């Protein structure tokens, strides 16, 4: 996904159970970290919320999308496979 620099996009992601790598994980408390333009990973500012059926969302801040280049997201939680995604900030 392409993200415009300085915007506040909402990122939606699915977490699955690490026990079978396919069952949607509900009731988790995910930690989301980002790497901006090749920098070190750091926690996102806003809280992550569960939508339903293993889907979660987090809204990035304008500061978090302020650097052009690769924006890597990593979501982890107890008993789930890590979720990773790469976006391009332009």
For the regions a protein language model found, what residue spans apply to each?
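Polar, enzyme-active/binding microenvironments
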Residues: 1-90
């Amino acid at each position: 996904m392409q993200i415009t620099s300085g915007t506040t996009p909402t990122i939606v992601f699915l977490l699955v159970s690490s026990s079978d790598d396919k069952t949607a994980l509900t009731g988790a408390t995910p930690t989301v970290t980002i790497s901006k333009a090749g920098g070190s990973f750091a926690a996102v500012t806003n809280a992550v919320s569960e939508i339903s059926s293993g889907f979660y969302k987090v809204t990035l801040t304008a500061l978090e999308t302020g650097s052009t280049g690769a924006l890597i997201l990593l979501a982890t939680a107890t008993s789930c496979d890590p979720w990773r995604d790469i976006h391009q900030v332009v």
